[in-house]
Regions:
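Positively charged, low-complexity intrinsically disordered leader regions
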Residues: 1-64
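Short, glycine- and charge-enriched coil/turn segments that flank and shape catalytic ligand pockets
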Residues: 31-39, 122, 150-156
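Phosphate/diphosphate ligand-binding glycine-rich loop within oxidoreductases
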Residues: 36, 42-147
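Glycine-rich phosphate/diphosphate-binding loop of Rossmann-like nucleotide-binding domains
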Residues: 52-64, 147-170
């Protein structure tokens, strides 16, 4: 496996790193919209969906992305697991690692849960929202939409004031 990388928050990402991630996302989007539609970049990887909170768009987007990238999907149902008997997040992610998960997509109602998961898990952790604290994948999506639609005229968001109310339409 490549060096472990997590996406826990966008606060620590530099502008060049944000641009790099957005460029990769745009490449994947173009492939997805093309005739090919799929790549197998993650064909030897297992992605575990670990959602402690209900989610429609975020969860389904990650499921579809995992399939489109060729990953094996581990769809973990928190409601029918030992979490209900008190199993800790750390124990749950260690179990997923023992079962072969290389990446965990975590949605949790507790701020900081993704950092705890990253400490306990030997693979990649993607924060799909941790309460009211952070939702870096949503932030990246919002930024990508802004760049694609608003800044397309001059290629820059510099000097613009932008307010986001509710969900962006994508």
């Amino acid at each position: 496996m490549a060096a472990t990388q997590h996406l826990l928050d966008v606060d620590g990402l530099s502008w060049p790193e944000l641009q790099r991630r957005l460029a990769v996302a745009e490449q994947m989007r173009a492939i997805r919209l093309s005739q090919a539609g799929r790549v197998n970049d993650l064909r030897d990887q297992s992605v575990a969906m670990l959602f402690y909170e209900a989610s429609t768009r975020t969860r389904l987007s990650f499921v579809e992305a995992a399939h489109a990238l060729g990953a094996h999907l581990i769809d973990f149902d928190v409601s029918s697991s030992s979490v209900g008997k008190g199993e800790s997040l750390a124990d749950t992610v260690r179990t997923l690692g023992a079962l072969g998960a290389t990446t965990i997509v975590l949605r949790h109602d507790r701020a900081g849960a993704p950092w705890l998961a990253a400490q306990a898990f030997g693979g990649h952790v993607l924060n799909a929202g941790d309460g009211w604290h952070a939702h870096p994948t949503q932030a990246l999506l919002d930024l990508a939409v802004l760049i694609r639609h608003i800044a397309a005229s001059d290629g820059s968001l510099a000097g613009r004031r932008i307010a986001i109310l509710g969900d962006l339409q994508i």
